[in-house]
Amino acid sequence: MSEHTHRTMERHCDVAVVGGSAAGLAAALQLGRQRRSVIVIDAGEPRNAPAAHMHSYLGYEGHPPSDLTSIGREEVRSYGGEVISGRAVDVSRTDDGRFRVQLTGGHSVFARRVLAATGLVDELPDIEGLAEHWGGDVIHCPFCHGYEVRDQRIVGIITHPMGLHPAGLFRQLTSRLTLVLHDGVAADDAEVVALRAAGATIVDEPVRRIVTGVDGHVEAVELMSGDRIDADAIAIGPRFRVRIEPFASLGLLAAAHPTGLGDFVETDATGATSIAGLYAAGNVTDPSQQVLAAAADGSRTGAMISFSLADEDIETAARPSGNEADWDCRYGGDQMWSGNPNGTLVNEVAALRPGRALDVGAGEGGDAMWL
């Protein structure tokens, strides 16, 4: 094995963002535009990965989730930010009060502030065939994917008392709605009566499995009795668990969510957690956020982090460019320059004739570029 294989990377920045989906990238964009050095660490596991399209995001309606992240990455890079594909395994405090974000492979990122934008994991009930259709014919949010199953045979599998909460919304989308009270779940009698009066069919019996048709799509819901309910789509309200394992060394704890369905990270109005210098945004703080709301939350939290850093710099009379030691650390590591072209530069030179040299004074080495 070569010596290069054993090399580890160290990066120094103002802000390390753990999580590279809507909230994390939006925060990084804000920070980059404030001339803050920011590094996004992305494990590539967004909550909406199983979905083919995202909805109710103005300007991105119906686009694959990957469109948002790929464009977002380039926008962050165009303002000098870095995006690293990797997994944060531990975040700890250093002796000088900064943070060390340790990645798989022994790599590290050192930062003055850290943003947790790690999202959450949806935990589906243990029903045969359910997970295979998650993000397709099995949905949970009427706002995210309800319109796409309008007028279809929707079967809502109710696994907890809160499961009836979106039933009225699905009733607005279809007249063919069946609600199955799975495994003896307690349901509000008045709510059940109202839904029945509105035309929904209510079945009180456990579900055995989801039946898949020859076309690979959901065909029916099979009950423990053997009865089948024909279905085109399944609505389910999963439990959820926030991804905060990397922050255990800092003592970050999750609080029980008011719905009783999972946990979340509590923050103040600026996005700050109970750990000084550690912020959180997106689904890790609010599981109900759609992509647009998560991005907005990340953007606002990024702005609040910028305020925090600016106040600290003024208080310590730091120069805007940072002190000499910071720059030595930043450029002393292996391959500091990311190799990613500046987005503005690309736009300016795209129409120029090939074969010419351009001296752009990039400031990170590699100043002369052959077109």
PLM segments and residue spans:
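FAD-site-proximal beta/loop scaffold in flavoenzymes
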Residues: 3-4, 132-148, 240-292
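Beta1-alpha1 glycine-rich phosphate/pyrophosphate-binding loop at the start
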Residues: 7, 13-67, 164-185
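A Rossmann-like FAD-binding core segment of flavoenzymes
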Residues: 70-103, 108-111, 174-262, 310-320
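Predominantly flavin-linked oxidoreductase catalytic cores and closely associated redox partners
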Residues: 107-216
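A conserved FAD-binding loop/helix module that cradles the flavin
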Residues: 283-317
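Conserved class I S-adenosyl-L-methionine
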Residues: 317-353, 355-363
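Conserved SAM-binding loop of SAM-dependent methyltransferases across substrates and taxa
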Residues: 366-371
